[in-house]
Amino acid sequence: MNGYVPTFRVVINDIRKSIASGQLKEGDKLPSLPELAQQYDCSIGTVRRAIEHLQITGELQGRQGKGTYVTGKLFEGS
């Protein structure tokens, strides 16, 4: 392997690190998808994939028309 990590995985790992370190706390709102895409220099679809993964694991919660929020729960799997 060459050590390549897909961008959506980088986003997932960064958000998880921010939650684990306390930089992001329960109830905190994440930046918008376009803002995150700009931050990671990737497409909105890539960021959406990462956010959806973190919603499935229960670490983030999307609120229609309001944004995406940290649940305070950290997934212990991969």
Predicted feature residues:
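A cytosolic small-molecule/anion-sensing beta-strand core signal
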Residues: 64
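Acidic, glycine-anchored pre-beta loop/turn
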Residues: 67-68
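Extreme N-terminal segment that seeds HTH/winged-HTH DNA-binding domains in transcriptional regulators
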Residues: 1-44, 49-52, 56-61, 72-78
